[in-house]
């Protein structure tokens, strides 16, 4: 079977779907088209063939987007895939439309709602309208949480088959349980993700600075690339000793291993992968009570929740974690690991894809 994958970047495909690629490549010819990036060579090592496909993943230029759809049509005509898998909004919409025009079956993954839908207004209306067109004939639409699925069904964006999967899951072996840190120098919170407003970076910096003023031994490690310009804010917080900014790291596992608690005050997620990784490592977590985050932890069992866009609520949750004994935090981390083993094993996601691919191949659409 010839399978084509359309996505907007290599990082998500490699970090969260590498095992799926490896599984698919065993019995199929798999081709992936996306803009070249840092992880492209590693993706090729899975057995997947790479085709460069550059486009603006953030812009909303109608002419540029129309050209992207035309290029997808040209690509599909050339490759003649038996099935197309799409991820992220533009490949979902324009790849989906191209598949419809050429009558090629496709399976879509809605990895999150994104700001274009969350913020409402004209852009939200336009995005929903495009999604209705792009997902209209999908063999199956995967969602990463029930709230997103419910919204798409309520607005009749999806009328056909859909199902919820546990995000991208987590590789339990790759993110193996690590002994909770004993003693050491101070207490380390850890944020892993893009440095941008929608990830809650402003609330995190403010809360970290306030806590550090009271407790000099508490530091927040920030790991990730800066999608937006927070250079000055990061510099001020780092000079105060409240944070350490590590930038983008190719391997975040050592940071999970040495932290005492992972924090993600995100405004919205499909499923918060960093919460899965931290929990799998055996660390308690703090995250917002929003779809895609709230499902990844059990309140007071594996971590604490806070209100979205609420610095005081975040600070309270962080201080609540600090007030626990080390043994209580360790117990939380062990409970978090068990939750990942039972609910978020990446093999569950792979099995769901294999089921839908088999179903599509057999014509049960």
Question: Where do the language-model regions lie?
Answer:
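Donor nucleotide-sugar binding/catalytic pocket of nucleotide-sugar-dependent glycosyltransferases
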Residues: 51, 132, 136-177
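Conserved acidic donor-binding segment of nucleotide-sugar-dependent glycosyltransferases
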Residues: 299-300, 304-312, 320-326
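Aromatic "clamp/platform" in nucleotide-sugar-dependent glycosyltransferases that forms part
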Residues: 248, 267
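Short His-centered aromatic/hydrophobic patch
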Residues: 86-92, 110
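A short, well-ordered alpha-helix in the C-terminal region of glycosyltransferases
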Residues: 327-343, 349-355
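Short hydrophobic beta-strand element within catalytic cores of glycosyltransferases
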Residues: 284-287, 297
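Short, structured helix-loop element that forms part of the nucleotide-activated donor/catalytic region
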Residues: 40-44, 210-213, 219-246
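A conserved mid-protein helix/loop that constitutes part of the nucleotide-sugar donor-binding site
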Residues: 14-19, 187, 191-210, 312
């Amino acid at each position: 079977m010839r399978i084509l994958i359309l996505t907007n970047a290599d990082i998500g495909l490699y970090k969260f779907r590498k095992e799926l690629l490896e599984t698919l490549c065993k019995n199929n010819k798999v081709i992936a088209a996306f803009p070249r990036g840092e992880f492209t060579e590693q993706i090729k090592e899975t057995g997947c063939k790479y085709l460069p496909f550059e486009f603006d993943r953030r812009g909303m230029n109608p002419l540029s987007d129309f050209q992207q759809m035309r290029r997808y049509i040209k690509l599909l005509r050339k490759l003649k895939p038996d099935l197309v898998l799409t991820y992220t909004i533009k490949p979902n919409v324009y790849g989906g439309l191209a598949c419809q025009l050429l009558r090629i079956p496709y399976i879509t993954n809605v990895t999150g709602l994104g700001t274009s839908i969350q913020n409402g207004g004209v852009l939200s209306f336009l995005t929903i309208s495009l999604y209705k067109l792009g997902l209209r004939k999908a063999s199956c639409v995967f969602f990463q949480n029930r709230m997103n699925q419910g919204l798409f069904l309520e607005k009749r964006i999806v009328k056909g088959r859909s199902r919820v999967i546990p995000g991208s899951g987590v590789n339990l072996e790759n993110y193996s349980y690590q002994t909770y840190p004993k003693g050491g120098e101070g207490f380390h919170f850890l944020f892993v993700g893009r440095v941008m407003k929608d990830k809650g970076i402003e609330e995190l910096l403010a809360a970290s600075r306030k806590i550090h003023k009271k407790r000099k031994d508490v530091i927040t490690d920030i790991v990730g690339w800066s999608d937006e310009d927070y250079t000055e804010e990061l510099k001020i917080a780092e000079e105060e000793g409240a944070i350490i900014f590590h930038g983008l790291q190719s391997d975040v596992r050592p940071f999970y291993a040495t932290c005492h608690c992972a924090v993600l005050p995100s405004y919205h997620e499909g499923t918060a992968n960093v919460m899965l990784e931290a929990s799998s490592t055996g660390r308690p977590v703090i995250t917002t009570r929003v779809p895609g985050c709230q499902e990844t932890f059990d309140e007071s069992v594996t971590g604490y929740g806070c209100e979205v866009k609420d610095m005081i609520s975040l600070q309270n949750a962080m201080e609540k974690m600090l007030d626990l004994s080390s043994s209580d935090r360790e117990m939380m981390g062990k409970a978090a690991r068990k939750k990942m083993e039972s609910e978020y094993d990446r093999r569950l996601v792979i099995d769901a894809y294999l089921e839908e691919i088999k179903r599509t191949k057999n014509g049960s659409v």
